[in-house]
Amino acid sequence: MNLQHHFLIAMPALQDPIFRRSVVYICEHNEDGAMGIIINKPLENLQIEGILEKLKITPEPRDPAIRLDKAVMLGGPLAEDRGFILHTPPSRFSSSIRISDNTVITTSRDVLETLGTPEQPSEVLVALGYSSWDKGQLEQELMDNAWLTAPADLNILFKTPIADRWRDAAKLIGIDILTMPGVAGHA
């Protein structure tokens, strides 16, 4: 079972403060473990334009049609000071890894320098930090019913409102997660 380019959808009973109601996009999954980015936990008061300002990056030439007020996600509890950019191809940047035909992850500054310009990839999600599982750990969590899995959907990854991603990811596999046991305030 390879879950690369899949979503992990937290089960309602998962109460870990970071992973509660989270959707994790799996970037890599192999015999050594897994790595992913949480796509629905926005960092408070941090947007893409704030990251660019902190790094002293000024988009040139600026394309006013491209919004830089999108939230930056908490990608996970590891390396929270390190940026990870999920985006659509091309993968011409110096530190890019193709995850699927339609998704790439880049960690180099050169992708940030394109944000807000005509050179920016068509879809972008910026995160600080990442999530990781050791060999066999994710498989055990799946057996323990901590997560649901679904093939990744680019609309959910890049376009669905952040607050709806958990519910909509579960709908991909026909589950209304808001009515499952363990969801407070719902029958």
UniProtKB/Swiss-Prot annotation:
Highest taxon of source: Bacteria
InterPro entries: AlgH-like
GO cellular component: cytosol
Disulfide bonds: none
Signal peptide limits: none
Annotated Gene3D superfamilies: VC0467-like, VC0467-like domains
Family membership: Belongs to the UPF0301 (AlgH) family.
Name this polypeptide is given: UPF0301 protein CKO_04323
Species this protein is from: Citrobacter koseri (strain ATCC BAA-895 / CDC 4225-83 / SGSC4696)
